[in-house]
Amino acid sequence: MVPSTFSRLKAARCLPVVLAALIFAGCGTHTPDQSTAYMQGTAQADSAFYLQQMQQSSDDTRINWQLLAIRALVKEGKTGQAVELFNQLPQELNDSQRREKTLLAAEIKLAQKDFAGAQNLLAKITPADLEQNQQARYWQAKIDASQGRPSIDLLRALIAQEPLLGAKEKQQNIDATWQALSSMTQEQANTLVINADENILQGWLDLQRVWFDNRNDPDMMKAGIADWQKRYPNNPGAKMLPTQLVNVKAFKPASTNKIALLLPLNGQAAVFGRTIQQGFEAAKNIGTQPVAAQVAAAPAADVAEQPQPQTADSVASPAQASVSDLTGDQPAAQPVPVSAPATSTAAVSAPANPSAELKIYDTSSQPLSQILSQVQQDGASIVVGPLLKNNVEELLKSNTPLNVLALNQPENIENRVNICYFALSPEDEARDAARHIRDQGKQAPLVLIPRSALGDRVANAFAQEWQKLGGGTVLQQKFGSTSELRAGVNGGSGIALTGSPITPRATTDSGMTTNNPTLQTTPTDDQFTNNGGRVDAVYIVATPGEIAFIKPMIAMRNGSQSGATLYASSRSAQGTAGPDFRLEMEGLQYSEIPMLAGGNLPLMQQALSAVNNDYSLARMYAMGVDAWSLANHFSQMRQVQGFEINGNTGSLTANPDCVINRKLSWLQYQQGQVVPAS
């Protein structure tokens, strides 16, 4: 018989072995939590992977996978699914999960274009409490919530984000910082107040001052940038210059000693081609001077209706107006200037150069490919044209090495180092209108357009620019012929300030509670259009005859106290406004090129005389004059961000693709007179 003491000792010795076996057996059935690496950003996957992991997990691990799936869905543009999954999150979350939930809520708000809602949520987050990868997302959300509007808060967010980024993202951050700085006016920059310890921000603001002082002198700009880099060697922008300033340092002026002018001289568009040629040659022979952009002109007397040339949709005419039957038949009178507030101008001129060799090529007589080959053989240093959109498309396909100032732009802009695009089109004017209306603080615009391809193009251009500026839905309403409008007036129907969305959005949200965020879908389009007079701006694209019916019809249906400001394109302004028309248009704002707004009276008189007082052709004449200025400053427009010419067709600047943006003059009918819009 074995002694009992021996049995007890043997059992005691076996116990640790048994316990260890049990422990290891338990570990063998437990799967490690893999969600941590994904939460911290050291590993990434798509939403399908996260959703699968979520279904196979439980408790905190399941919540982590759910949060990751929401983040991925937002990134993939699947906002509706993200909202649905977000609303399924449990109430009980740990601190880390709560912070992630709030950050996700802000990111969803941004995806739904609810920028105010996103800003409210971001204000509840303390960046120092976040993980490093969350901090980068937080600052990006702050940047996105600013909608690109330059401000001190946007600059601070960009500066805070920069150290958290990789090399590629750093360049994007630095470019965005410079974009914010260079988008400010000098007046905005002068109002900025910073703290004494914000050394990086101070450096950026000093670079901004260098740019303000020298942006129209590339040589001075180069020297200023080099000096700034020496004074601020530790600034991120000094170590990695903004791309636009790298281009400045590489600046080389283009030659205009031998110019090829490509225009249609036969067929339907010939009238425009020959008018542009007239303006270009006049500027070449007598030079150009900066134009006062904010001077209005009011007709001194009734002005006769002038026949307007009818053109194909592809022609770059800004105001293809039909004949109005509501204007007088007296001889045309010259506009009289009206005083206006002085504004700072970019003092850039293009001197006369009569000796420069200019050769005209008719794009209506032979294929563009043959013309371009001939231009190269002739040794042209710069090409101005072509004018028609289909010819510009052909130009891009040719991959010509020549510097080209195209007088139109294709449907899809291509960034070519040797091409700039200068268009006088209704779409270009609509984009300026979107910027002007947005600057006036309007939130809910309606576009009133003719039922035509022209109307569709204008509506799309306006909506695209509006949303690029951070705006939401744009509504459109179409009208028919003048006879249909007349019938509407006679029938007393009026025009309601409602419409259909130009670019409907599947989901935007209406609100979120503070303690338990819940994301909801957007109000319907009917709710948007009928929600207590939400429309606060109406942009009208109409001829003088059409707008003479449209404005009274809006008042007839909505009353004079509708709260919506009315705006119109230059299509409604053809130099035909008599005193009755001006009184009827009371309060209406409309856009016009500075030359015809009284900013350059000598040239206006010269242009109107050359085109028999046809305002549409006068605009094309001004385009020819500005084309000379742009050709003489081609390299500056192409390479120097912020370079500006106060031209006859607008204040001219170039975007990164070298599309020439035109800031137009805006005028207003007031007590029978035309004055600068306030």
Swiss-Prot record:
Positions with biased composition (Polar residues): 311-327
Region (Disordered): 300-340, 496-528
Superkingdom in the source lineage: Bacteria
GO terms classed as biological process: peptidoglycan biosynthetic process; regulation of cell shape
Disulfide bridge positions per record: none
Keywords assigned: Cell outer membrane, Cell shape, Lipoprotein, Membrane, Palmitate, Peptidoglycan synthesis, Signal
GO cellular component: periplasmic side of cell outer membrane; periplasmic space
A Pfam match: LppC
Any one GO molecular-function label of the UniProt entry: enzyme regulator activity
InterPro entries, A to Z: LpoA (IPR007443), Lytic_TGlycosylase_superhlx_U (IPR008939), Peripla_BP_I (IPR028082), TPR-like_helical_dom_sf (IPR011990)
Record SUPFAM superfamilies: Bacterial muramidases, Periplasmic binding protein-like I
Compositionally biased spans, kind Low complexity: 300-310, 330-340, 513-528
Signal peptide: 1-26
Lipidation positions, renumbered (S-diacylglycerol cysteine): 27
Topology in the lipid bilayer: Lipid-anchor
HAMAP family, A to Z: LpoA
Family designation: Belongs to the LpoA family.
Function of the protein: Regulator of peptidoglycan synthesis that is essential for the function of penicillin-binding protein 1A (PBP1a).
Subunit structure: Interacts with PBP1a.
Record-given protein name: Penicillin-binding protein activator LpoA
UniProt gene name: lpoA
